[in-house]
Design a protein with these regions (language model features):
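Short acidic, S/G/P-rich loop/turn micro-motifs used as interaction or catalytic elements
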Residues: 41, 84, 103-105, 131-133
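Active-site proximal loops enriched in glycine and acidic residues that flank catalytic Cys/His/Asp
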Residues: 56, 79, 101, 128-130, ...
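Conserved proline-anchored active-site loop of SAM-dependent methyltransferases
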Residues: 34-38, 96-105
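Conserved acidic residues
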Residues: 29, 95, 122
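C-terminal substrate-binding/active-site "lid" region of AdoMet-derived donor-dependent transferases
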Residues: 109-171
Length: 171
């Protein structure tokens, strides 16, 4: 839709539908969104009634804050890099961990694992960027690495909204 802050909204909604998670009642549960700015996926989470902790050094679209107020859900934006997170300050009950950070998999996957080890989210939706042929050739390696720390089962595909990236869903 034209009124959403970014393309991440579409990628998140497609991931939910692909796994059949679009029918889940997520109201009142907590999501942790790594790489949240400008707020497309966060917007979708809030539309579904989730409380969201967003992690990103970037600015959030004001529509995200407005929607959170209108929906009566909590949205906190920590303006820090995922690698600088104080893990002990993260919520302990995380239903969904999202990550859509524009970094190469060898840089971002260890950060996802570090956060997942701390919060033990029940489900993960990850966008893994494969911006070069060399990274594309290693896609199976990256998925196997994610399988080592993510809740089972782990699935990966390229959704219609994905460009040079794959969607990995776990849990």
């Amino acid at each position: 839709p034209a009124d959403v802050p970014s393309r991440a909204w579409l990628k998140f909604e497609q991931a939910l539908a692909w796994r059949g998670w679009d029918q889940l009642d997520l109201r009142g549960q907590t999501a942790l969104d790594l790489g949240c700015a400008p707020g497309g996926a966060t917007y979708a989470l809030i539309q579904r009634g989730m409380n969201v902790l967003g992690i990103d050094t970037g600015e959030m679209d004001p529509r995200v804050l407005d929607l959170a107020k209108a929906q009566g859900v909590r949205f906190d934006h920590w303006r820090t890099a995922a690698g600088r997170l104080n893990l002990t300050a993260l919520p302990r009950e995380v239903a969904l961990l999202l990550c859509d950070i524009n970094l190469a998999p060898p840089l971002v996957i260890p950060e996802i694992q570090r956060v997942q080890d701390a919060v033990q989210a029940r489900r993960l939706i990850l966008t893994i960027k494969l911006n070069t042929p060399a990274l594309e050739d290693r896609a199976h390696e990256f998925i196997d690495t994610i399988r080592d720390f993510a809740p089972a089962p782990v699935f990966a595909t390229q959704l219609a909204g994905n460009r040079r990236e794959i969607c990995v869903c776990a849990g």
